[in-house]
């Protein structure tokens, strides 16, 4: 029979090396994977635009990856080796095709803590605060994507309309039992979904801190680095 629009993901647990706690990850149903591919094809440039607004983010999609694969060594001249691979922005990322998008600025969190940027911030500021959004993906309300893209008032006016944000919302629901509370952890598209929402929060934070009673200026009084792992 015809496959339901909403699907059930395959869940499994992983444990970090040396850690005690496990974490639930999920694989999307193949039907939803195909729907995600169609969504990328239709909206990739808009997704890139929405992920380019935050001054805080240190891991975000920056451009479409070119589908160029490394050929067999026996067929490659040494001087051409660097041309026969997918386009990557960080030389340390492996040469295999990993993602539809290329990323800036750090693909792994530890690289930020060993970077010149981190050293500069240490020298500039006397205090460091670290924050974590616990179980972030599991608690994301999918309708929030509309608020992030269009604003809460306009989003209400566009409920049920065929818009990018409503399509993205529906896609994430269909990947996870048709639930609006939480998105699955693991797929790249989930991180992009969260990044769009958090970029809007980043901008709201900057604007709020400019106002009284804070009157704080980004780059002078404080700086923020945010990362989705």
Q: Which stretches of residues belong to each language-model region?
A:
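Conserved two-metal-ion catalytic palm core of "right-hand" nucleic acid polymerases
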Residues: 1-185
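Short, well-ordered loop/turn elements at secondary-structure boundaries
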Residues: 122-126, 188, 218-221, 227-229
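Short acidic-aromatic active-site loops that bind/stabilize oxyanions
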Residues: 183, 187-191, 195
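Active-site palm subdomain of RNA-directed nucleic acid polymerases
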Residues: 193-228
């Amino acid at each position: 029979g015809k496959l339901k629009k909403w699907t059930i993901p395959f869940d499994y647990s992983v444990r970090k090396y040396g850690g005690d706690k496990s974490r639930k990850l999920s694989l999307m149903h193949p039907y939803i994977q195909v729907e995600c591919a169609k969504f990328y094809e239709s909206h990739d440039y808009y997704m890139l635009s929405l992920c380019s607004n935050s001054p805080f983010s240190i891991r975000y999609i920056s451009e479409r990856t070119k589908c160029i694969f490394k050929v067999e060594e026996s067929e490659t001249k040494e001087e051409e080796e660097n041309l026969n691979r997918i386009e990557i922005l960080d030389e340390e990322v492996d040469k295999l095709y990993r993602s539809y998008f290329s990323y800036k600025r750090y693909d792994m969190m530890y690289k930020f803590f060993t970077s010149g940027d981190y050293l500069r911030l240490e020298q500039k500021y006397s205090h460091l605060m670290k924050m974590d959004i616990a179980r972030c993906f599991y608690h994301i309300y999918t309708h929030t994507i509309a608020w992030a893209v269009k604003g809460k008032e306009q989003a209400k006016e566009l409920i049920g309309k065929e818009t990018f944000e409503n399509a993205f919302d529906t896609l994430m629901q269909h990947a996870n039992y048709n639930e609006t509370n939480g998105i699955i952890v693991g797929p790249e598209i989930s991180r992009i979904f969260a990044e769009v929402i958090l970029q809007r929060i980043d901008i709201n934070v900057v604007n709020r801190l400019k106002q009284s009673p804070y009157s704080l200026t980004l780059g002078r009084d404080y700086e923020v680095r945010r990362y989705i792992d």
